[in-house]
């Protein structure tokens, strides 16, 4: 069944590039009115023009609660409401644990974890009025499911998002607001593309499906959580990694 979000309003944080842009594109194609929320208003507007379907850009910094409150207020004013929040904004600068500074830790935590809190808190007053409010977090397999060297701070924030989600889903249930999370594996984004073709081939070889994911793969997973078909789903995760977390020994056994 093809999910439709025709006429519903959606805010996507970090929606001007990478996974966020993929989510925004899939939602726009499903008929939603998409607000691209990012610190860089010019980038947001450029993506909105590219998407069409009534999409528009909104300036908002997830590290500031006041900024996110202003952004969600603008989305509500321009759309006449807010039905879906995709809390996607995140950063992942590599840093080895022994060499990591407090400033590096704080930068990742402020964006990925506190930014999720700010985005959700700012959206709640409007989602409550929707009577079918949806929150979709972009988490990761790194942290909640597995580890990856050089991203201790990132993994901690992504695991923290799920702890936040599992408590928030209980508090928000009385408003008929659901909150779920998509856990991407290795997805082709600007960041991964910058690591070179050899690195991409190595990563793809480690995936049972023998390819890297596309941003639209994450967009379609998020679309399910935002759809009416997922009305009875909350506090849950969906891993989208091509089978990457399956132990190599089990994959080898399956191919025997």
Model-based region annotation:
Residues 16-18:
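Conserved glycine-rich cofactor-binding loop
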Residues 234-256:
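Short C-terminal tail/terminal secondary-structure segment
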Residues 125, 170-171, 231:
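Alpha-helical segment proximal to the catalytic Tyr-Lys
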Residues 174, 181, 197, 201-233, ...:
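C-terminal helical subdomain
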Residues 8-9, 80-82, 127-141, 174-177, ...:
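Active-site loop of short-chain dehydrogenase/reductase
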Residues 96-97, 104-109, 192, 203:
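Substrate-binding pocket helix/loop in short-chain dehydrogenase/reductase
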Residues 120, 157, 165:
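Active-site helix of classical SDR
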């Amino acid at each position: 069944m093809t999910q439709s979000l025709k006429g519903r309003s959606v805010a996507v944080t970090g929606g001007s590039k990478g996974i966020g842009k993929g989510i925004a594109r899939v939602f726009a194609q499903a008929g939603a009115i998409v607000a691209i929320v990012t610190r860089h208003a010019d980038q947001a507007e450029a993506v909105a023009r590219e998407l069409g379907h009534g999409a528009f850009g909104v300036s908002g910094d997830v590290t500031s609660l006041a900024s996110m409150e202003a952004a969600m207020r603008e989305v509500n004013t321009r759309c006449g409401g807010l039905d879906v929040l995709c809390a996607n904004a995140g950063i992942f600068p590599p840093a080895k644990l022994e060499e990591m500074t407090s400033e590096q830790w704080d930068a990742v935590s402020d964006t990925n974890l506190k930014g999720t809190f700010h985005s959700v808190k700012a959206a709640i007053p409007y989602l409550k009025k929707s009577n079918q409010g949806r929150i979709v977090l972009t988490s990761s397999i790194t942290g909640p499911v597995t580890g990856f060297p050089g991203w201790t701070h990132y993994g901690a924030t992504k695991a923290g998002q799920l702890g936040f989600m599992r408590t928030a889903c209980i508090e928000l249930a009385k408003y008929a607001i659901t909150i779920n999370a998509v856990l991407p594996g290795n997805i082709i984004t600007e960041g991964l593309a910058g690591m070179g073709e050899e690195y991409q081939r190595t990563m793809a070889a480690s995936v049972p499906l023998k390819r890297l994911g596309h941003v639209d793969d994450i967009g379609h997973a998020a679309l399910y959580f935002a759809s009416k078909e997922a009305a009875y789903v909350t506090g849950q995760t969906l891993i989208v990694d091509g089978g990457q977390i399956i132990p190599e020994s089990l994959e080898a056994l399956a191919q025997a």
